[in-house]
Amino acid sequence: MKNEGEKEGLNISRCRVCKPGSTLINKTGGWRNFRPVYIYEKCTKCGICHIVCPDMSVKPRENGFFEYDYDYCKGCGICANECPADAIEMILEEK
């Protein structure tokens, strides 16, 4: 008899760890509907976007600004919502 994990195709058994969804080999940015874009003229380099990103797709640059790794950004908009300077705009993703 198959356990619940095997029924779903996961083959989960005791003492195993499931692979996480956001890893270097599991690029998760391909299904987003909106893309965050920086407005560098407004950015104060506070780093809140970097701190709140659940996928760690906001990367610091040498000049103090930040950039997105769009391979992993899911477009959740948390960075834009939390930015105190309104320096991040969510734009419709072009497919």
Swiss-Prot record:
Cofactor: [4Fe-4S] cluster
Stored SUPFAM superfamilies: 4Fe-4S ferredoxins (SSF54862)
Cofactor binding note: Binds 2 [4Fe-4S] clusters.
Binding site for [4Fe-4S] cluster 2: C53, C73, C76, C79
Chain sites annotated for binding [4Fe-4S] cluster 1: C43, C46, C49, C83
SS bonds (residue pairs): none
Record keywords: 4Fe-4S, Electron transport, Iron, Iron-sulfur, Metal-binding, Repeat, Transport
All residue ranges annotated as the 4Fe-4S ferredoxin-type domain in the record: 34-63, 64-93
GO molecular function, one term: oxidoreductase activity, acting on the aldehyde or oxo group of donors, iron-sulfur protein as acceptor
Subunit structure: Heterotetramer of one alpha, one beta, one delta and one gamma chain.
NCBIfam families: PorD_Arch, PorD_KorD
Name used for this protein in its record: Pyruvate synthase subunit PorD
Organism of origin: Methanosarcina barkeri (strain Fusaro / DSM 804)
Name of the coding gene: porD
